């Protein structure tokens, strides 16, 4: 069944041109490189005991590692909990407790911010041509992300997003924008 992870697989097999560009760092990646580096992070997470259905908090600066970590979590059938780097320890602790996060993906600068098992992504640039980790099968109704609200009327709430939600949103955006294979899209939202 087509979902976010298999969508990435399908594109990695047919596109060898750069599909991701970070102007801040001048990083450029094609779909196969993204899939290989995503697989390396997923392999590391699997070695940390992460499995389908586990909830993983991401606490990184805006970066390609953030995006690849998100894809890696989905590749394992786990559930991503994206957070913003401006969150305080108190805000993170609330989300960790509420979401029942099992692990936090972060970096050296933030490794001591809260008491939760951590994974710090290594230099994944070395894995651009690495071995692809097969994706865990997921259905459209499987949860892939807990997106916490701003909490303007109380405590933040974890909105449950499924693989089907994401895939449908991507499909609809491509239809509305009439995007074609050679089009360029600029993502401006912070992670």
List each model region and its residues.
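Conserved AMP-binding A3 loop
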Residues: 30-32, 144-171
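Conserved pre-ATP/AMP-binding loop-to-beta segment of ANL
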Residues: 15-16, 131-148, 155, 178-184
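Conserved ATP-dependent adenylate/AMP-binding module captured primarily in the ANL superfamily
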Residues: 85-113, 130, 169-186
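A short N-terminal helical cap/helix-turn-helix that marks the beginning
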Residues: 1-19, 36
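Conserved AMP-binding/adenylate-forming core of the ANL superfamily
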Residues: 19-49, 54-63, 67, 71, ...
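Hydrophobic alpha-helical segments in the ANL/AMP-binding
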Residues: 9, 46, 64-83, 93, ...
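A short helix-loop-beta submotif of the ANL/AMP-binding
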Residues: 55, 61-81, 85-89, 98-103, ...
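ANL superfamily adenylate-forming
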Residues: 109-141, 155
């Amino acid at each position: 069944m087509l979902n976010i992870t298999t969508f990435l697989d399908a594109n990695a097999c047919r596109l060898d041109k750069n599909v991701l560009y970070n102007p801040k760092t001048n990083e450029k990646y094609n779909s196969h490189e993204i899939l290989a580096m995503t697989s390396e992070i997923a392999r590391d997470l699997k070695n940390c005991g992460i499995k389908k259905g586990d909830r993983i908090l991401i606490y990184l600066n805006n970066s390609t590692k953030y995006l690849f970590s998100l894809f890696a979590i989905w590749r394992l059938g786990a559930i991503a909990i994206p957070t913003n780097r401006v969150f305080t320890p108190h805000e993170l602790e609330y989300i960790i407790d509420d979401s029942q996060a099992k692990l936090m993906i972060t970096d050296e600068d933030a490794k001591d911010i809260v008491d939760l098992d951590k994974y710090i992504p290594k230099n994944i640039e070395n894995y651009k041509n690495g071995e692809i980790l097969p994706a865990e099968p997921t259905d459209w109704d499987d949860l892939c992300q807990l997106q916490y609200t701003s909490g303007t009327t109380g405590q933040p709430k974890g909105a449950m997003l499924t693989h089907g939600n994401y895939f449908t949103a991507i499909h609809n955006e491509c239809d509305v924008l009439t995007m074609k294979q050679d089009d360029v899209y600029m993502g401006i939202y912070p992670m």
